[in-house]
Amino acid sequence: MNEIEKRVLSTKWFYHFKLPSGAVTEVYIPEEIAGIHSTREQMMGNVLDPLFGGRWSETTAVDLACHEGYFSIALAQRGCKRVLGIDAREEHIRDAELIRSAYGLPNLEFRTGDVTKFDPAEVGQFDIVLMFGLIYHLENPIAALRVAHALTRRVCLIETQIAPNLDATVEWGSQHFVKPTVGVFAVVDEWEDLHGAPKQAGLADIALVPSLEAVLWIMKRAGFTRVEVVPPPPDSYEQLARGQRVIVAGYID
């Protein structure tokens, strides 16, 4: 075990990282919640491995809201030509850089950036776009989904908590004119999460949590040619198994 791994193992993390020596990091979240990450990774692989297996060395990926870089590392270890992880919090990027050093992955880089203010032209397009655990923390999740689409060359995976849907109509200027709702956003107060420690919420204290119908409709309207809900595997993390969280794949065909 080298000095970098010793530094990594001296603290607790959001993820269980299995380091090159075989040592595994401790987590500061409850173990029953930490299981979400292995389910996410398995669902990610179930979509991406059939598409890019055998061609990873020609494939590029960006991980938006990468946190400590868990999924960025999973893609870099598959042999991606280039993986870029972006997160708004500098402390997350510092942690991700330390983890990257422990793995020694030259095809992986991290940078600080706010997805809600991001100009896709700055980095170009990627074969794979990940956006896990982000949009339900945002004031403007639609803008984030548009950014994700602009960055996507082949496939984008969105993972999110979802709100209940409402099948209804809205009066539109007169009682004689109505429009059907195509999806719902629930308003959530994240003030305590934002001002607590460790910070896992978004950068604002108001969050809009979408219904599944909203995610599917907006991704199609944003320009994805095909949008599919990724089925959870057996023994999934309970929220994904119950459909309270989902991974949605958006394709550019």
Locate each region found by the language model.
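A structural helix-start
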Residues: 90, 138-139
